[in-house]
Regions:
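Nucleotidyltransferase catalytic core that binds NTPs
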Residues: 1-209, 218-220
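Phosphate/ribose-recognition catalytic cores of enzymes acting on nucleotide-derived substrates
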Residues: 197-273
Length: 273
């Protein structure tokens, strides 16, 4: 969506290493913003973005005007009946309709062999994978790890909204993520136990207000009570002041058990790609 940072750069660098040409979409998509959200104030700096893309190895930056992507009387959207009613979809009801629509259009225009998405927007990653499967796009979706600041905060364009005090307060998200991940990796399998511990860390921060902290089946985005034999997503959205931030971790029991498929975590066996 533009105002690129080191997280985006890591996607471009990986894509450039694995492909002949890389096209970067730099487009603030109006259809994924609700009427009270930050479309107008969302940070933009196209020249800065182009420099980052060039340094990372991109061949082309796709930067259309909204009027080029959406005709004045446009009335066709890509909507998903499942995966979009939990987590961010609960409080952002039109968000994923906008995401699916614009990504479908980008795929039709660019015709990529692979598309790279960051894990920070993990629900979006699951939604795009399902859309690609359901609509028979001949595209490999590659999920890439969250890139963090040195103190743990997940990189985000919206971090620029934070005051110095809020920036410090925002570290409660990564502290909660790391604590929950440590519990799960140590063998805790009860979702409520993990989530309660994570919520307690966030609730101890006066500037933080929880939107959600939930654990779901990563492929289907359905809440679970216990970690069993499928990859799980433990995700949160938290307001720090007026700024809504997200963070998460993904746990795959197959990786702990030692997956025997030989895929190295990059095939459908281990990551749903």
């Amino acid at each position: 969506m533009g105002f690129l940072h080191e997280g985006h750069k890591s996607l471009i660098v990986r894509a450039a290493a694995e492909n002949d040409r890389v096209v970067v979409s730099d487009f603030v998509n109006p259809t994924q913003f609700g009427p009270t959200e930050d479309l107008e104030s969302y940070p933009r700096d196209f020249e800065r973005d182009c420099k980052l893309c060039e340094e990372a190895g991109a061949a082309l930056v796709f930067h259309p005007e909204p009027s080029e992507m959406y005709a004045p009387n446009a009335c066709t959207y890509v909507n998903m009946d499942e995966l979009t009613h939990e987590l961010c979809g609960l409080t952002r009801p039109i968000h994923f309709r906008g995401v699916c629509t614009v990504v479908s259009k980008l795929f039709h225009i660019v015709c990529p062999d692979r598309a790279y998405f960051g894990q920070k927007d993990a629900q979006q990653l699951a939604v795009i994978r399902r859309m690609v499967r359901d609509l028979n796009f001949d595209i490999q979706i590659v999920g890439c790890p969250i890139i963090r600041e040195e103190d743990g905060l997940a990189k985000s364009s919206r971090n620029t909204y934070l005051s110095a005090e809020e920036r410090t307060a925002a570290l409660c998200l990564s502290r909660a993520v790391f604590a929950g991940q440590k519990m799960v990796e140590a063998g805790e399998r009860d979702a409520k136990t993990v989530l309660d511990a994570m919520r307690a860390i966030i609730e101890a921060e006066p500037l933080a207000k929880i939107d959600y902290v939930k654990m779901v089946d990563f492929e289907n985005i359905v809440q679970i009570d216990k970690i069993e034999d499928v990859p799980v997503l433990c995700a949160m959205a938290v307001y720090i002041g007026k700024t809504r931030l997200i963070d998460n971790f993904i746990y795959d029991p197959a990786e702990d058990a030692g997956c025997g498929c030989g895929c190295g975590g990059d095939s459908c066996c281990c990551c749903g790609a």
